[in-house]
């Protein structure tokens, strides 16, 4: 979807992805101490619900979105509270985030919107470039494992996910999950930046 269309969605209040509540899969991940408060980047921050929830728990968060109206709404939610949370209107694929390396990157339904394999590979490479050594990327991705449908947000197969990530990232966990607010299937994908390239298969002799 072009940047203009995202902005139009926020102008019209047509935001089916915005539940107004922090994503349960993220909440469970944080509450299980799988990531501790650290410098964090959220890509596709929307109106800031998840970013603010993280900041309330001690994370130092930068939230990015291509839609300036989304960022305006997120800043209104922040409303001068004493939190380490900032929002910026920025195209993550084209511009470098201003805060430097992040130890935790999060997106919910952003990676999945890119239809071309090259775009998804580029997205993953950009995440790898912004991750600090040992940093984690948690991506929640619409899954093709759900029932057939004619319309709705993009969905990706496990193969599409791994093909995009593996050149630049080591996949630590890829499992089926659900976007509970919409009762739809999802992938829970946790990865980290590669320190050595992925190796080709060896021949059995």
Describe the residue ranges of each PLM region.
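Short catalytic micro-motifs in class I SAM-dependent methyltransferases
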Residues: 109-113
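A conserved beta-strand element that flanks and buttresses the S-adenosyl-L-methionine
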Residues: 106
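Short, flexible, mixed-charge acidic loops at enzyme active sites
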Residues: 102
């Amino acid at each position: 979807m072009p940047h203009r269309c995202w902005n139009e969605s926020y102008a019209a209040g047509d935001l089916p992805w915005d539940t107004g509540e922090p994503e349960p899969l993220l909440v469970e991940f944080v509450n299980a101490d799988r990531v501790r408060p650290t410098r964090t980047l959220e890509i596709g921050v929307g109106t800031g619900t998840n970013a603010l929830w993280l900041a309330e728990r001690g994370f130092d968060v930068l939230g990015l979105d291509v839609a300036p109206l989304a960022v305006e709404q997120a800043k209104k939610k922040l409303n001068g509270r004493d939190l380490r949370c900032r929002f910026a209107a920025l195209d993550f694929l084209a511009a470098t985030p201003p805060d430097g390396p992040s130890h935790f990157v999060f997106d919910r339904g952003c990676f999945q919107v890119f239809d071309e394999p090259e775009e998804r590979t580029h997205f993953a490479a950009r995440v790898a470039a912004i991750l600090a050594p040992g940093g984690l990327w948690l991506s929640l991705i619409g899954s093709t494992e759900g029932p057939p449908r004619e319309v709705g947000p993009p969905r990706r197969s496990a193969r599409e996910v791994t093909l995009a990530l593996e050149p630049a990232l080591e996949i630590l966990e890829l499992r089926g999950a659900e976007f509970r607010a919409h009762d739809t299937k999802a992938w829970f994908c946790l990865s980290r930046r590669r320190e050595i390239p992925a190796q080709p298969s060896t021949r059995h002799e």
